[in-house]
Amino acid sequence: MTDVPVSRLRNFCIIAHIDHGKSTLADRLLQDTGTVAGRDMQEQFLDNMDLERERGITIKLQAARMNYTAADGESYVLNLIDTPGHVDFSYEVSRSLQACEGALLVVDASQGVEAQTLANVYLALENDLEIIPVLNKIDLPGSDPERIKEEIEAIIGLDTSTAIACSAKTGLGVSEIMQAVVDRIPPPADTLDEPTRALIFDSYYDSYRGVIVYFRVISGRISTKDKVLLMASKKSYELDEIGVMSPDQCEVNELHAGEVGYLAASIKAVADARVGDTITLLNAPADEPLPGYTEAKPMVFCGLFPTDADQYPDLREALDKLQLSDAALKYEPETSSAMGFGFRCGFLGLLHMEIVQERLEREYDLDLIVTAPSVIYKVNMIDGQMLMVDNPATLPDPQKRESIEEPYVRMEIYAPNEYNGTLMGLCQERRGEYIDMKYLTTERVTLIYELPLAEVVTDFFDQMKSRTKGYASMEYHLIGYRRNDLVRLDVLINAEKADPLTTIAHRDKAYSIGKGLVEKLKELIPRQQFKIPLQASIGSRIIASESISAMRKDVLAKCYGGDISRKKKLLKKQAKGKKRMKAMGKVDVPQEAFMAVLKLNQTS
């Protein structure tokens, strides 16, 4: 299986925006090369998680090995490394690009070039990959291949004279793509005689065999007899098995430079086999690891709490297990007076957060409360210290701090130009700073804004999509921190501070957010036997308040006429009971209330 000469290997990936047909094209390639039998075929074959199929997105990286007989009669081995297209998962894209020599750039022939496509193309160009433009969905009535070719040339600067038109759905043009992969993507460098180095581009946890590591051999060879050393974690392992994915795992004895495969070595946690780490041989280690890996940094933080306190150990275990397959997920224990014990978790972005939450609820049967997402703020203290704060409730008091800095992103929005005004309005509402506007073609425009990450992480994406009927797409990257007039907005329910509802807001927006918040809570918190005051405060100053009136029992129902003092006595007794109840009473805050905070931050 592995005696393929390096010259007949091709490693490639598919770059595409969400919904441009990447997973469908991958399915078609698997089917056309006979890698997957027709009867086993299902849509989005490489998307293993149910969640991926439902949302129609690729989250975890997959790889597949295909045998293909080219026009010259030679048999080639093609390794397809499937990549996610969503901006949150760009770290997964960057590492899979390092494992390839070429890429298929798939563009929807009716939609044109979108934001994430561009971000990933630039990553691919940085890695010196050979890029083959592919126009997909040409069977659709709205497709306009010539216009899209001009767009690709104008925006990316790629020559599209050899672009391939195809329809992944019907299979049209797929054989031309296979031939182009063989003809135009270079084979891996012939480095069989150099010290063994292999790049880990993905790993997942298998409950029977431990961590399964997907890797690409960059130089030398690896066989089942070898002991391997992971250069970043400095841990060594004996190999249990190595093999290739076609796309089901298939064991082999040896893999050499240029090949893509998997290994199992009873590795206990994914943290020991970090993605981007270099595998080398224990007996003959390489001098230095492969360059270019940076650890994924969480950008968005939120609290996760079980609704039932007894589920806390289960939540810890579930997060431990999820982290085995998701190296970008960070978490630490957190306690809150209102919610009890839970965890503060860090994510790459909002989609990543939603997916982790959904996987916890679905795969581990947990019922969770999620607090409003926040970002990392830099707080400069009066005594000269600098703190990094990811939880608004832990922000120091105003008298102790000198200033707060928040992360800013540079955002590029691509959209048809009739939506210009509404998009500029949206960015303005979110404290955006206009930088530039470029016309890509006569119909499409790029808006460039710099805005606070905190304004982006909640529902900016949803708002952008709804205001442009789904036609706009965006891409952003961090550009640094800026000082702003920010305040901590606390919410008091029945005179008790509710930590999970605390947010950090700009002073100009604080009043409207606070007012909206208490009004929303008034709708969502069920009435109790006693009156509940709801207040929003900045420091000790109350800026907005509402109250939920008490339910009361008619204690006078059994008094017919009679003496007024009898009625007064009963009413007095009731008032006394209510007072005691108010002092002792706990108010349960429903999950919707926490989610309302997110929406409010934005609409104000």
From Swiss-Prot:
It comes from the Bacteria. Keywords: Cell inner membrane, Cell membrane, GTP-binding, Hydrolase, Membrane, Nucleotide-binding, Protein biosynthesis. GO terms for molecular function: GTP binding; GTPase activity; ribosome binding. One of its GO terms (biological process) is positive regulation of translation. It is a peripheral membrane protein. It is found in: Cell inner membrane. Required for accurate and efficient protein synthesis under certain stress conditions. May act as a fidelity factor of the translation reaction, by catalyzing a one-codon backward translocation of tRNAs on improperly translocated ribosomes. Back-translocation proceeds from a post-translocation (POST) complex to a pre-translocation (PRE) complex, thus giving elongation factor G a second chance to translocate the tRNAs correctly. Binds to ribosomes in a GTP-dependent manner. Belongs to the TRAFAC class translation factor GTPase superfamily. Classic translation factor GTPase family. LepA subfamily. This is Elongation factor 4. The gene is lepA.
